[in-house]
Amino acid sequence: MAFAAETICVQGSNERRDPFGAISMPIYQNAAYAHPGLGQSTGYDYSRCGNPTRDEVQKTVALLEQGTEALAFSTGMAAITALMEIFFPGDHLIATDDLYGGTLRLWNTISHKNGISVDCVDTSNVETVKAAIRPETKAIYLETPSNPMMKVADIQAIAELAHAHGGILIVDNTFLSPYFQKPLTLGADVVVHSGTKYLEGHNDTLSGFLVVKDDALYQQLNNIYKTTGACRLRLIVGYCFEGSRLWLYVWSSIRKMLWRSHTGWNRDRKWRKYIISVWIRDRIRR
């Protein structure tokens, strides 16, 4: 049975695996785990490689994005840094020209030093993206909407373009969140999140996520994740989705909804799929 996004935000993966029957997932602070006996495992060995609380958050994010697996990182930049480890010297990426500064800094310094090149183009124009593809292009990286100029790309069309040339499509879904946009259902291979923003409310925690549907890609990323160690802290994991739960309260307080294609912006059909903003009532009834 598929649950609504609101239910997933509140209930998580709904897997009640706590041995003491806790309804809310406990925050497991331990670094290591005791096993029942020689050759017997609880499924957890060391918290860098796996933690019950972190696993619950990862499953919840995967469900929200309609992916199969997710990995929770200490920050959004840690997630992107780990993702770049799937590429090799000589590989080429195409990316949105209006992009978060931290991502650009990573590419212009560390990725460049490692022999990976990135060309930033106007990804709101599919033909411009197509013209930038080279034989060594391994991925197209979109922010849609972009940070900070809110440019929108056609995820489905660019996914088809990337796959036709043997590459993958990566989509940073931070600005819309899985509530409004699910790139994996439109053909993306990897979804990136800075969970610090809308998933958690931008006030309490730092986090990042990678979400995928392909098992081989997940295994590759999970190996990088366990090896490099930029995993999510246990206590911080416990605060994940407080912003999403707050959203359920705020939603009842909306006075007016704005749809970008109705307010003088480019009325191309692709705008209808992505952008929404709202006015909040002056007084919120509890």
Indicate where each model-derived feature is located.
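Conserved PLP-enzyme active-site core in the AAT-like
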Residues: 9-11, 70-269, 274-275, 279-285
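N-terminal glycine-rich, Lys/His-bearing helix-loop that initiates the first secondary-structure elements
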Residues: 1-44
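Conserved N-terminal alpha-helix of the aminotransferase class I/II PLP-enzyme fold
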Residues: 32-81, 86, 102-109
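Compositionally biased, intrinsically disordered low-complexity regions enriched in proline and serine
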Residues: 29, 34, 45-47, 142, ...
